[in-house]
Amino acid sequence: MKQSNLLIPDLQRMLGEKITEESQRFLVKSGFLGSFQDNQYVFLPLAMRVIENIKNIVTEELEKLSAVEFQLPVQSSLHAEEYLSTLLLKEPENLQNNTSMQLYQIQTALIANQKKAGHFLTNFESTYLDAFSFHETSVSLSENYHRYEQLFRRILARCDLQFQSVIALNKETNQQDTKEIIADSPEGDEHYCASSESDYRAKIEVATRLCSGKKSHASYLPLVKKTFAENIEEAQGQWLKSYFLRAGKQPIVLFLRQEDQLNLAKVTNFFKQKVVQVKPKEIEKYFGQAREMLDVWNLPQEVTYLGDLEVEFLTNTKMIAPHSEQEYYENINPLRDFPNVAFADFCFVKEGDPSPDGQGVLIFKKG
C-alpha cells in the first residue's frame, strides 16, 4: 500500500478532547481511525488492512474445525442461534447425517443501548464473530467445547494479544461452568479478578474467595434486644445484615457480614432458579408478617434461612432489627440461633481477598 493512498487526515485537533488514552491517540495519529460523529468512527485504509488480516486468521482457524460461514441480515430481528435452531428443527436430516455441524458468521451489529456515550472507542456498531456447534450427543458437544477453547486461544495468540481464560457466568442459564477468553487491556469494559500467585481467573460475578472463618471457642452469650445509643458506623464489634428474598414464591432470609455485598447471581445458582429481593410492601405477602412487626425468629416454617460462609462461625455478633433501625440484636450466634440455616458463598469478592486456592490474593483487572 503506497503512502500516498493511506488517507491519514490530521484529526488530532478535532478528537483531542475525547482521547484520553495513549493507545487511542496512537490509532488516530497513525491513521487507523477517524472521527465521524459521537460514538461512531471511520475505519481508514490502514485499519481495513488490519481487519482483513484478522478475518483471514479467524477463517483459517475455523476451517481447521470444518466450520462453514453463513450470515444473517444486519437488521435481522432473530439471533443467529434462534435462526439455526429453528432451521435444524425443521430439517433435522442436516444433523442426522453428521456427527456435528459447525457454523460461524462475522457480522456487524448495531448496539441499541450504548452505555459509554462520548467514549471515543465505544462505537454504536461492533463486529462480532459468532461460532455455533450442533451435536447429536453430549459427549461430542463436550469434546468440541474444548476444541473451540483452543481455537480462540490460537486466534488471539496469532494476533499477538495477551489473554486470560476466565471462569464466567452464562447469563442466559445462570450456569457458572462457562469460560470466557479475555484480552488484557486497561481500556476494557470487562472486569475480572486474578490470583497474585496462581492461575485462578474469574469474572467478578462468579469469583470466590478462601473463607477466613474459624470455629471460635468463645462461650455463647444470651441473645438480647437493645435500643441504639450510637450510630451503626461507630458501633464496635461484628455486625450482620439480613436480606429478604424469594425464589418464585419460596421466601428466603439471608445473612451476611455488614462489610460484604450480596451477590444475587450466586443465590440464584444455589436455588437453580431466579432469586429476587422482596420489596418492603411485599414482606407480609411472602413472610406472613408486616415489615414493622417482622421477627426473624418467628417466621413461618416454609422460610429458608441462608448464611454466607463467613457468617457460620461468628460468635456473639450483632444485627439491626429488620423491623426498626433504632433497635438491634446482640449476641447472635448463627449455629445456635438459626439451626436450619444453610451456609454457602453468597458474596461479591473484594480486591485483596485470599484466593480460593489459598495461593496469593485477588487482584482486579480489565480486558
What are these regions (language model features)?
Residues 6-10, 32, 40-43, 49-50, ...:
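Residue-level preference for alpha-helix termini and adjacent loops
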